[in-house]
């Protein structure tokens, strides 16, 4: 998992399609309005019924998760004053959670995306 940090601000979290670790691996730390985790369990593993503790959360912007099902794109990440602070290429199977700042895309190959 790659955390895109600029000036001590977490802008994005990227999970690559070839990432693999056993068990539950949280990408987020509980400070974000969404929880994102990678899970890998063997057949027969049971995740017990559970509920999340109610929390009052204040959001100052829309956070989103994008899953690139297929294709290839470049995402540009921008600061709040619209200055490009970095770019990353994503390929089919990659995930990105956008937490702060702005973003734009260039589609490099025909692509299918899901946005949450």
Descriptions of predicted regions:
Residues 38-60:
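Conserved short histidine dyad/triad with adjacent acidic residue
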Residues 1-38:
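A short, N-terminal "cap"/entry segment at the start of jelly-roll beta-barrel domains
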Residues 49, 75-76, 96-98, 103-108, ...:
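Short beta-strand His + acidic residue motifs that chelate non-heme Fe in jelly-roll/DSBH
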Residues 42-43, 61-78:
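Glycine- and acidic-residue-biased ligand/ion/polar-headgroup-sensing regions
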Residues 38, 65, 110-116:
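A short hydrophobic beta-strand segment most commonly corresponding to one strand
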Residues 42, 68, 91, 98-99, ...:
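A short, compositionally biased micro-patch
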Residues 55-56, 81-83, 112:
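Short, surface-exposed beta-strand-loop junctions and turns on beta-sheet-rich folds
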